[in-house]
Amino acid sequence: CTGALIVLERMNNLDEIIRTGTPLSADVIPEMLGTIFYEGTPLHDGAVVIRDGRIVAAGCVLPLSNNLEMGKDMGTRHRAGLGMSENSDAIVVVVSEETGIISLAKNGVLIRRLDRQNLFNLLQEEIIPPETAEAQKQPLLNRLLNKGGAGKHAKTNAAR
């Protein structure tokens, strides 16, 4: 099993973390992540940082969590993921090297034992802000309401 530690930068700038690793400018594709996290490669023990949909660094060192409630079954990778989420608004995906179990750290909380679909859903919720998702729905709603002139009447009646 190959472990992974993937940091998704959000509002907090992570330049300080990025400087601890090797700078990259790469697409986020399975082949690239697989190469980075392949056991034995120089970058596989650190974290990948993703900014604006691009891998900007690999082999980065993250702050470790001091959370005493973490189970003994969680190693350095999980402590680093949790620590990063305690110190920033970043979202961190952790894949256990030993078990392959997927976890997600955000706001100092580690959500464990995610399958791919649950991870996808959580990331989609976190990465696409509600106002953006709502804005994406607006053109469809406008088309539906304006079909056959119903939208004009609905707007006029709503304004009264």
Tell me what each language-model feature is.
Residues 1-160:
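Divalent-cation
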